[in-house]
Amino acid sequence: CRIYAEDSSKNFLPSIGRLTRYIEPVGKNVRIDSGVVEGSEISMFYDPMISKLCTHSRTRTEAINEMINALDRYYIEGVKTNRDFLSNILQKTSFHSGLYSTSFISDEYPDGYNSNSVSIKNREILYCVATFVNFQYLLRAASISNQLKGFNKTVGNMWNVVDGKKNISVKINFNNFNNNYDVYLLNKHFSIKSNWKIGYPLFSAIIDNKLHYFAINRDGVRFK
């Protein structure tokens, strides 16, 4: 995959600017060729390619999954990129089958690529991640030293996640039996295990026995 500074939802319009944050994925099955670092300028005078990402594994399917995970582990701020678009392509059934042609994009995206299109299942995972991350921030705030006796802060475990005009009730508990967090929302249960630390922009967790990666951007009480 070639990671480009471009807006895939606007007919791949180049996105120029400075890479204010730039973290590349690492792994034994991952190779990256790049000529940029954090702080580099993506100029209108040159090709806006950021890097080339290669993955390998025993089978095509495994290599594709390695690629998806590697794309998820990129953290890029300052410019728009085609990272999500590439990940979306890699998850298409037609791509997995290998039966595609040079008209792949027009066939699969006749109305263009919608970067805001998120499946219901993925939205539920996002709600879980937002709940977990917010809980960690609240736990840290409640553990500040030198609190007045009798006024120690406690953290509740039931909140609302706001997604546009939607309000989703959520509940989170720490499970002492398996050191996981249990999140309940929309009459469903999710199990989360993560070693994520506050302040690190890349979030990784095993959610219902599947590894997920997310870029975390906190703005006040909002996450994106």
Summary of predicted features, one role per range:
Residues 152-154, 165, 196-198, 207-209, ...:
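Short solvent-exposed loop/turn micro-motifs enriched in small/polar/acidic residues
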Residues 161, 183-185, 205, 216, ...:
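Short aromatic-centered micro-motifs
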Residues 10, 207-224:
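Structured, non-catalytic alpha/beta "coupling" segments that mediate domain-domain communication
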Residues 156-158, 180, 200-204, 213, ...:
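Short, acidic/polar N-cap/turn motifs at the starts of alpha helices
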Residues 175-177, 199, 219:
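Structural motif
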Residues 188-212:
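A conserved acidic, glycine/proline-rich C-terminal tail/linker
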Residues 2-191:
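Catalytic cores of soluble metabolic enzymes centered on carboxylation/carboxyl-transfer
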